[in-house]
From Swiss-Prot:
The chain crosses the membrane at residues 54-74, 76-96, 97-117. This is Oleosin 18.5 kDa. Residues 1-45 are annotated as: Polar. It is a multi-pass membrane protein. May have a structural role to stabilize the lipid body during desiccation of the seed by preventing coalescence of the oil. Probably interacts with both lipid and phospholipid moieties of lipid bodies. May also provide recognition signals for specific lipase anchorage in lipolysis during seedling growth. GO terms for cellular component: membrane; monolayer-surrounded lipid storage body. Belongs to the oleosin family. Residues 46-117 are annotated as: Hydrophobic. It comes from Arabidopsis thaliana. The lineage of its organism: Eukaryota, Viridiplantae, Streptophyta, Embryophyta, Tracheophyta.
């Protein structure tokens, strides 16, 4: 009932534009002529589906036939020329790989040299603080190792002298 007060979808769009929608279609089907309408619609759907499916089936079969023909023609050529083509392809792949890697290593080297230059001139590039702290840690560890070596060296040589004194100064070999 509320639809009649505000108007239906058909009243807003206009009945002339879509004559077989909503209540009109329901009345048409109830009059007995609607079964013909739905059957013709089903036939149209089926015809469209058969046409689309058939054309796709034809296209896929043409693609398959084209692929088989291309392989039939290309396989003997590939077999005949494989002693030439395979080494040539390997050579080309190695050349491309070599040029790309040398270019990448060159860019990396330029970047490293630029960073070292900035660091040496005192510009403090990114990461230099980490390098300085690592250098300080390494220096302190090296100093600790040197001190321990001197301590154990003195202890070791001092220990032999103590043993020699207890034996009366005689060295045994």
């Amino acid at each position: 009932m509320a639809d009649t007060a505000r108007g239906t979808h058909h009243d807003i769009i206009g009945r002339d534009q879509y004559p077989m929608m909503g209540r009109d279609r329901d009345q048409y089907q109830m009059s007995g002529r609607g079964s013909d309408y739905s059957k013709s619609r089903q036939i149209a759907k089926a015809a469209t589906a058969v046409t689309a499916g058939g054309s796709l089936l034809v296209l896929s079969s043409l693609t398959l036939v084209g692929t088989v023909i291309a392989l039939t023609v290309a396989t003997p050529l590939l077999v005949i020329f494989s002693p030439i083509l395979v080494p040539a392809l390997i050579t080309v792949a190695l050349l491309i790989t070599g040029f790309l890697s040398s270019g990448g290593f060159g860019i990396a080297a330029i970047t490293v040299f630029s960073w070292i230059y900035k660091y040496a001139t005192g510009e403090h590039p990114q990461g230099s603080d980490k390098l300085d702290s690592a250098r300080m840690k390494l220096g302190s560890k090296a100093q600790d190792l040197k001190d321990r070596a001197q301590y154990y060296g003195q202890q070791h040589t001092g220990g032999e002298h103590d043993r020699d004194r207890t034996r009366g100064g005689q060295h045994t070999t």
